Structures are given as structure tokens and as C-alpha cells.
Amino acid sequence: MTLAVKVPLKEGEIVRRRLIELGALDNTYKIKREGNFLLIPVKFPVKGFEVVEAELEQVSRRPNSYREIVNVPQELRRFLPTSFDIIGNIAIIEIPEELKGYAKEIGRAIVEVHKNVKAVYMKGSKIEGEYRTRELIHIAGENITETIHRENGIRLKLDVAKVYFSPRLATERMRVFKMAQEGEVVFDMFAGVGPFSILLAKKAELVFACDINPWAIKYLEENIKLNKVNNVVPILGDSREIEVKADRIIMNLPKYAHEFLEHAISCINDGGVIHYYGFGPEGDPYGWHLERIRELANKFGVKVEVLGKRVIRNYAPRQYNIAIDFRVSF
Ligand SMILES: C[S@@+](CC[C@H](N)C(=O)[O-])C[C@H]1O[C@@H](n2cnc3c(N)ncnc32)[C@H](O)[C@@H]1O
């Protein structure tokens, strides 16, 4: 037996919406028709409605999406985000202004549907600052920010509040791994907690992994142990000040990578490959970056061969996160 609001058939939809607004609708039971009435399952007695005890059928199918069970007013449902990131057992979601008042409902629904998710955070700012982190606002589940994320066969321990990490780049990291050759020396200029470095360590002879964020380096050191790799050298500092020679350089700092190009070219070995990342506008997202690369190639008197370029993902409206791979020959 469960509690249900009994309403005339023709008022059913209006009452259902009202119950959603009140957070009273119990989605775990099905609505039942009884003659000219509907029995709408509720979580608690609701003032102003006739509440009865009823035998209702339980909803047996496990929902596929939090959107199927979340209690938000019908007219706002169209604003519900269709995707969010899951990093280890932590979900991070961008909630539009219209739904900010329902953030906790959304968080609760995510925890309910995704059994592996233990904590949910709402994005509280854009990615900003030198460390490329953002403010996170806790909306559901446990108040934890440290987790272990699995991707491409490696484990990455990290704190989502203290370091940059995006699970959306997993395919890009695998693509770079596939391009890498056995026995190379790699310079990961903006290593973070090591998703490129640790993966590439499986092929490379040596990986220099630099980051300016002490938390990133702390987790990188833990991840080196966690993944039992012995050829990654963590370096805390500004990668412009690190003088190494490498066959492959990864420049995963899209917002500022162009400022580091000169140093990258000075670190690359003859015939080496640079994986450059940037942001660019719709239409020609590569043009500005390719010009910078060619300018510097002229300045250094080296040859540049573009091996590939692609859009990785949308970054903002009409702005793309792009990648350019190029070979440098002396
Ligand atoms: C976009 S994140 C990429 C992290 C990592 N490659 C990944 O895929 O998760 C850029 C990283 O560059 C680091 N960073 C920013 N400026 C730097 C600098 N001058 N030298 C070294 N690292 C820097 C930030 O702390 C941040 O961890």
C-alpha cells in the first residue's frame, strides 16, 4: 500500500504537475485509473488534496537517465542538461540559470539513477586561472572531492576541486598514444595529474611531466605509483623554464598554448612531433594558430609539416577546442 492523491480524471494532469512542483510525486509507483478518478502516488500527504491508501503497481524498469525521475516543473524540463561528466564516482553538471533552484533535486536524481555516483557538484564558475580549475558547488551525495578515475586502462587519482581533469579528452589521449612510437622521449608540458604522461609511459622511454599546480604534481606522483610506471619524471614549475629535448611534446593548455610555442620548438628534436591544442572560432578554428606556428617556424629556421588537425569538442557557443599535430624538421 502507498499514499495516493485521488483526483477526478480531467484534473489529473494539472494535479500531477502541481505535485511535481511540491516535490511530492512518487515516481516509483505508477498512476492508476479507478472509474472516473486517478490515483497519483505521493511521497507524503499533501494539504488541499484527498489522500488515500492505494494498491499501486511499482515502476519496475530502472530509469536510464536522471531526467526520467527528477522532480522539476513540467515547463522547465526542457532546460534539463542532457549530459554531465562523471569523474570516478563524482558527477559534475552544468545547471542552467532557469534550473538553479532545483539543483538539489537534480543532484539527488543523478545519485539515484547512477549507482556508482557518490557525490554530485554543480559548476559554479568557468574554468579559470593558471591551474585551470573551477568553483564547484556540492548539490547531492557525499561531500567528497577526491576520487579515482579509470580511462584507457590506467587509474588516475585526483581531487576535482584542486586540479584540472576532463574525462571528455579520453579519446584524444588514446589518439596521441596510438601516434606515439616505442622508445621516444616525451615532454608533457601541462601534465595535470598525468592522463597523457602515464598512458604514454607505456611506449616511451622517458616522459617529462611538468605542471605548475602543486596539487597536480602531488596526484601525478601518486598516479605513477598507482600505475606502476617507472619512467615518468614529475616536474613542478613553469614548463617554459624546463630545458629538455624530446621527440614528442604535448601542449594541452588550449587557452595559452600559443604563448609556449617558442619554448616547445626549442625543446623538440629533429623530426619530433608537437601536439598543440587551442581554442578557435567557428568557420576557421585553426587559421590563427597555424599562422603562429608558421611564424615561429620561420623565426627558428625550421620546417613544419602539419600531420593532422581536428575539432575535439565545442568549448563555448561558436568556439571549438582544436588540436593540431605537426612535425618539426631542422
Ligand atoms: C588544461 S589542463 C591539462 C591537464 C592534463 N594534460 C589533462 O589532460 O588533464 C592544463 C594544465 O596546465 C597547467 N599549467 C598552467 N600553466 C602552466 C605552466 N606555465 N607550466 C606548467 N603547467 C602549467 C595547469 O595547472 C593545468 O594542470
Swiss-Prot record:
Gene3D superfamilies: 3.30.70.2580, Met-10+ protein-like domains (3.30.300.110), Vaccinia Virus protein VP39 (3.40.50.150). One of its GO terms (cellular component) is cytoplasm. It comes from the Archaea. It catalyses: guanosine(37) in tRNA + S-adenosyl-L-methionine = N(1)-methylguanosine(37) in tRNA + S-adenosyl-L-homocysteine + H(+). The keyword Transport does not apply. Its EC number is 2.1.1.228. One of its GO terms (molecular function) is tRNA (guanine(37)-N1)-methyltransferase activity. It is found in: Cytoplasm. Keywords: Cytoplasm, Methyltransferase, S-adenosyl-L-methionine, Transferase, tRNA processing. Its main location: cytoplasm. It is an enzyme of class 2 (transferase). Specifically methylates the N1 position of guanosine-37 in various tRNAs. Belongs to the class I-like SAM-binding methyltransferase superfamily. TRM5/TYW2 family. This is tRNA (guanine(37)-N(1))-methyltransferase Trm5b.
